[in-house]
UniProtKB/Swiss-Prot annotation:
Bilayer disposition of the protein: Multi-pass membrane protein
Organism, scientific name: Psychrobacter cryohalolentis (strain ATCC BAA-1226 / DSM 17306 / VKM B-2378 / K5)
Protein known as: Large-conductance mechanosensitive channel
Alphabetic keyword roster: Cell inner membrane, Cell membrane, Ion channel, Ion transport, Membrane, Transmembrane, Transmembrane helix, Transport
The protein's assembly and partners: Homopentamer.
Protein backbone atom coordinates (compact mmCIF):
# COMPACT_ATOMS: atom_id res chain seq x y z
CA UNK A 1 0.00 0.00 0.00
CA UNK A 2 1.44 3.35 -0.99
CA UNK A 3 2.01 6.18 1.42
CA UNK A 4 -0.64 8.32 -0.29
CA UNK A 5 -3.32 5.65 -0.08
CA UNK A 6 -2.47 4.95 3.58
CA UNK A 7 -2.75 8.64 4.38
CA UNK A 8 -6.02 8.90 2.46
CA UNK A 9 -7.44 5.93 4.40
CA UNK A 10 -6.29 7.47 7.70
CA UNK A 11 -7.58 10.96 6.92
CA UNK A 12 -10.99 9.80 5.76
CA UNK A 13 -11.75 7.66 8.80
CA UNK A 14 -14.71 8.93 10.77
CA UNK A 15 -12.79 9.63 13.98
CA UNK A 16 -10.19 11.80 12.26
CA UNK A 17 -12.85 13.85 10.51
CA UNK A 18 -14.80 14.22 13.77
CA UNK A 19 -11.63 15.37 15.50
CA UNK A 20 -10.91 17.91 12.76
CA UNK A 21 -14.42 19.32 12.99
CA UNK A 22 -14.11 19.45 16.79
CA UNK A 23 -10.81 21.34 16.62
CA UNK A 24 -12.21 23.89 14.16
CA UNK A 25 -15.37 24.43 16.20
CA UNK A 26 -13.28 24.57 19.39
CA UNK A 27 -11.11 27.33 17.94
CA UNK A 28 -14.16 29.34 16.96
CA UNK A 29 -15.74 28.71 20.35
CA UNK A 30 -12.57 29.95 22.10
CA UNK A 31 -12.85 33.20 20.14
CA UNK A 32 -16.48 33.56 21.21
CA UNK A 33 -15.51 32.92 24.83
CA UNK A 34 -12.73 35.52 24.64
CA UNK A 35 -15.20 38.09 23.31
CA UNK A 36 -17.70 37.14 26.02
CA UNK A 37 -15.11 37.81 28.72
CA UNK A 38 -13.61 40.98 27.24
CA UNK A 39 -16.74 42.58 25.78
CA UNK A 40 -19.54 41.46 28.11
CA UNK A 41 -18.35 40.16 31.49
CA UNK A 42 -15.49 42.58 32.18
CA UNK A 43 -17.53 45.73 31.39
CA UNK A 44 -20.25 44.50 33.77
CA UNK A 45 -17.63 43.84 36.46
CA UNK A 46 -16.13 47.30 35.82
CA UNK A 47 -19.58 48.88 36.16
CA UNK A 48 -20.24 47.07 39.45
CA UNK A 49 -16.81 47.94 40.85
CA UNK A 50 -17.16 51.53 39.71
CA UNK A 51 -14.17 51.84 37.45
CA UNK A 52 -12.51 50.42 34.40
CA UNK A 53 -10.86 47.07 34.89
CA UNK A 54 -8.12 46.32 32.41
CA UNK A 55 -6.12 43.27 33.35
CA UNK A 56 -3.60 44.04 30.59
CA UNK A 57 -2.36 46.93 32.72
CA UNK A 58 -1.64 44.62 35.64
CA UNK A 59 2.05 43.75 35.44
CA UNK A 60 5.36 43.98 37.25
CA UNK A 61 8.45 45.40 35.59
CA UNK A 62 11.39 43.06 36.10
CA UNK A 63 14.39 45.30 35.84
CA UNK A 64 14.96 48.92 34.96
CA UNK A 65 12.86 50.67 32.35
CA UNK A 66 14.68 53.41 30.45
CA UNK A 67 13.31 56.93 30.40
CA UNK A 68 10.93 57.73 27.58
CA UNK A 69 9.31 54.28 27.47
CA UNK A 70 5.62 54.37 28.30
CA UNK A 71 4.66 52.40 31.39
CA UNK A 72 2.29 50.08 29.57
CA UNK A 73 2.60 46.36 29.14
CA UNK A 74 2.75 46.54 25.34
CA UNK A 75 5.28 49.40 25.24
CA UNK A 76 7.58 47.74 27.78
CA UNK A 77 7.48 44.40 25.94
CA UNK A 78 8.15 46.17 22.63
CA UNK A 79 11.20 47.81 24.22
CA UNK A 80 12.49 44.38 25.27
CA UNK A 81 12.05 44.99 28.98
CA UNK A 82 11.12 41.87 30.96
CA UNK A 83 7.59 42.15 32.31
CA UNK A 84 5.65 39.76 34.53
CA UNK A 85 2.24 40.16 32.88
CA UNK A 86 0.03 38.51 35.49
CA UNK A 87 -3.01 40.48 34.27
CA UNK A 88 -2.90 38.78 30.87
CA UNK A 89 -2.67 35.45 32.67
CA UNK A 90 -5.77 36.30 34.72
CA UNK A 91 -7.67 37.09 31.51
CA UNK A 92 -6.64 33.79 29.92
CA UNK A 93 -7.56 31.95 33.13
CA UNK A 94 -11.03 33.52 33.17
CA UNK A 95 -11.48 32.56 29.50
CA UNK A 96 -10.44 28.99 30.28
CA UNK A 97 -12.75 28.67 33.29
CA UNK A 98 -15.74 29.92 31.32
CA UNK A 99 -14.93 27.64 28.39
CA UNK A 100 -14.41 24.64 30.69
CA UNK A 101 -17.72 25.34 32.46
CA UNK A 102 -19.61 25.60 29.17
CA UNK A 103 -18.07 22.37 27.88
CA UNK A 104 -18.87 20.67 31.21
CA UNK A 105 -22.50 21.74 30.90
CA UNK A 106 -22.66 20.50 27.30
CA UNK A 107 -21.18 17.11 28.24
CA UNK A 108 -23.58 16.88 31.18
CA UNK A 109 -26.53 17.58 28.86
CA UNK A 110 -25.36 14.99 26.31
CA UNK A 111 -24.91 12.40 29.07
CA UNK A 112 -28.40 13.14 30.38
CA UNK A 113 -29.86 12.69 26.89
CA UNK A 114 -27.94 9.42 26.45
CA UNK A 115 -29.21 8.12 29.79
CA UNK A 116 -32.76 9.07 28.86
CA UNK A 117 -32.39 7.21 25.55
CA UNK A 118 -30.97 4.16 27.33
CA UNK A 119 -33.83 4.13 29.85
CA UNK A 120 -36.35 4.53 27.04
CA UNK A 121 -34.78 1.63 25.11
CA UNK A 122 -34.76 -0.55 28.24
CA UNK A 123 -38.45 0.19 28.84
CA UNK A 124 -39.29 -0.63 25.23
CA UNK A 125 -37.37 -3.91 25.46
CA UNK A 126 -39.09 -4.80 28.72
CA UNK A 127 -42.50 -4.09 27.22
CA UNK A 128 -41.79 -5.93 23.97
CA UNK A 129 -40.40 -9.14 25.42
CA UNK A 130 -42.04 -10.58 28.52
CA UNK A 131 -39.85 -12.61 30.81
CA UNK A 132 -39.74 -16.41 30.62
CA UNK A 133 -41.87 -16.66 33.76
CA UNK A 134 -44.58 -14.47 32.24
CA UNK A 135 -44.53 -16.49 29.03
CA UNK A 136 -44.82 -19.74 31.02
CA UNK A 137 -47.69 -18.37 33.12
CA UNK A 138 -49.50 -17.29 29.95
CA UNK A 139 -49.11 -20.76 28.48
CA UNK A 140 -50.41 -22.40 31.67
CA UNK A 141 -53.30 -19.95 31.80
CA UNK A 142 -54.18 -20.68 28.18
CA UNK A 143 -54.11 -24.45 28.80
CA UNK A 144 -56.23 -24.10 31.94
CA UNK A 145 -58.66 -21.96 30.00
CA UNK A 146 -58.99 -24.67 27.37
CA UNK A 147 -59.58 -27.37 30.04
CA UNK A 148 -62.32 -25.38 31.81
CA UNK A 149 -64.30 -24.88 28.59
Amino acid sequence: MSMVSEFKEFALKGNVMDLAVGVIIGGAFATITKSLVEDVIMPIVAFIVGGEINFKNMFLILGDAPEGVARTNDALKAAGIPVLAYGSFITVLINFLILAFIIFMMVKMVNRLRRADEVEEAIEEAIEEPSEEVQLLREISAKLGNINK
